[in-house]
């Protein structure tokens, strides 16, 4: 995992505690990772050729959308606490993403958040975006997300990074 934040190693430490190799990249006043940072991170991590590299960019919905990091699949993560209109407010990241993960769904009983409206907004911006609703607290929806990852990782086309991620489908 390459973990990007402006400051701290908090998230990298949490990831590392699971046994996963992680490199922290702090951008200081910068609002995103760039390809050169990813290249340096990969050189430091030295992942095996058949491994999966996950990149968590700096946590905003504007700057990271503007930079190609060479990823095969782009995933945008949206918490239900942020409001269902985020895909309309920040369309560029949703337009470029292959997947939207809607998180913290265990909080829905306590919020005024319209899941269907959020998904509709995301689909208006990007009709091909796949949506997974998950809760890290309860585990709800994680099997579907893991299934997506497993399918793509074991797919022969996974080895071909030139193939568009939108061409594979379960």
Regions found by a protein language model. Give the residues of each.
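Amphipathic alpha-helical transducer elements in NTP-driven molecular machines
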Residues: 9, 32-35, 39, 55, ...
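Residue-level signature of catalytic and energy-coupling elements of molecular machines
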Residues: 5, 56, 103, 118, ...
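Canonical P-loop GTPase G-domain recognition
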Residues: 99, 107-164
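Nucleotide-state-sensitive switch-loop elements of NTP-binding domains
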Residues: 1-71, 83, 94
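Conserved C-terminal guanine-recognition region of P-loop GTPase G domains, centered on the G4
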Residues: 60-73, 77-129
């Amino acid at each position: 995992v390459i973990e990007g934040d402006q400051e701290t190693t908090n998230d990298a430490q949490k990831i590392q505690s699971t046994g996963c190799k992680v490199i922290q990249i702090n951008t200081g006043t910068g609002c995103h990772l760039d390809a050169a940072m990813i290249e340096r991170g990969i050189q430091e991590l030295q992942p095996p050729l058949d491994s999966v590299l996950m990149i968590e960019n700096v946590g905003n919905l504007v700057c990271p959308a503007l930079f190609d990091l060479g990823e095969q699949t782009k995933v945008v993560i949206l918490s239900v606490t942020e409001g269902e209109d985020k895909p309309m407010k920040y369309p560029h990241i949703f337009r470029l993403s292959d997947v939207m993960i809607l998180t913290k769904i265990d909080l829905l009983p306590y919020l005024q958040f319209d899941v269907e409206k959020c998904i509709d907004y995301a689909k208006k911006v990007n009709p091909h975006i796949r949506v997974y609703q998950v809760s890290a607290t309860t585990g709800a929806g994680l099997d579907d997300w893991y299934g997506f990852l497993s399918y793509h990782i074991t797919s022969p086309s996974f080895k071909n990074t030139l193939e568009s991620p939108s061409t594979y489908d379960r």
